[in-house]
Amino acid sequence: MSVAAPRSIAIVLVAAVADNGVIGRANALPFRQSSDLKRFKTLTMGRPVLMGRKTFLSIGKPLPGRTNIVVSRNAGFAGAGIVVTGNLDFALDVARGDALRRGVNEIAVIGGADIFTRLMPLADRLEITHVHARPEGDTHFPPIDASQWRAIEQSELPAGPRDEAPVTYVTYARA
């Protein structure tokens, strides 16, 4: 894969990851974390969001205030309010162009596991909500290699009234 997005437009992976690495179960989030959904909105609003088809289907509709770019191997997949492509490099080009038009300097990559794994080598930053729970799941975030990433910001929060578990928000930058 070529590097389609110039370094001036950061690639940021945004995910909620359980202590056991789980990010999904049966094409849905494996936990309820209302406070994290607010953080997710803050991190992605006004930016292009890049995701796989299954992630888009789990959300169920385009995220408002963001250009929704969906990567799918299914050539017949389409939807209103989204840009669909089968090519990840093209998706990054579209996201980069959208970021420039919007006057923002980053692309938010929001899943799923295959997209995270493929873009981890190109990512500039990780915005991870570490959910302190161990749910069953069938989808996992790729390992965060401590030789490649360092935590630059961290805050712990207890479970709120509409959260299933306490969390630690961590921003990782390249080591």
PLM regions: where:
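Enzymes that bind and transform nitrogen-containing heteroaromatic metabolites
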Residues: 2-175
